[in-house]
Regions:
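N-terminal, positively charged regions that mediate nucleic acid binding
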Residues: 1-38
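Short glycine-rich or small-residue beta-strand-to-loop segments that form or flank ligand, phosphate
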Residues: 4-11, 42, 49-57, 126-128
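Conserved small/polar residues in nucleotide/adenosyl-binding loops
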Residues: 149-156
Length: 160
């Protein structure tokens, strides 16, 4: 039986990547000020709106709204005509303190009994289809994405 197999690669402006970059920027800020911060941050975005949720434990406060706006603008969403930009989008922060149950699971002196809280680990596989051991469809998708990201960034193709 024949089947079709495909892979996807998205650039920095894709909504999933925007959400990941916002979460990453927030985590980086927490860790810059308190290396023992515990962060579980989820970000969702849509037309004109960003929702940030999760559990945090840190000795420091960070300005979630400013970091979020700066990240969106750095990605390139800077014009209201995009219907999503860092200057005017709504930002809802539903961050709260890490639960005591998770705290007990992740704060242990014995590293072998250390828990991961509610965080999971995703993994893939290596194959010999390409030099970097990635499936050829994914490797090609990444190459195309890198190429058109370069064309957009250098304004070679202004419509991108």
């Amino acid at each position: 039986m024949a089947y079709l197999f495909s892979s996807e690669s998205v650039s920095e402006g894709h909504p999933d990547k925007v959400a990941d970059q916002i979460s990453d920027a927030l985590l980086d800020q927490f860790l810059a000020y308190d290396e023992n911060s515990r962060c579980a941050i989820e970000t969702f975005n849509t037309t004109g709106q960003v929702v940030i949720m999760g559990e945090i434990r840190s000795k420091e406060y960070i300005d979630i709204s400013t970091i979020t706006r700066n990240t969106i603008n750095a990605i390139g969403y800077t014009k209201a005509e995009y219907q999503f930009d860092g200057n005017s989008c709504g930002i809802l922060s539903a961050i709260h303190e890490q639960s005591s149950d998770i705290r007990r699971g992740v704060d242990r002196n014995d590293a072998e009994n250390q828990g991961a809280g509610d965080q999971g680990m995703m993994f893939g596989y290596a194959c010999n289809e390409t030099e970097n051991y990635m499936p050829v469809t994914l490797d090609l998708a990444h190459l195309i994405t890198v190429s058109y990201t370069h064309l957009r960034a250098h304004e070679t193709l202004r419509y991108l």
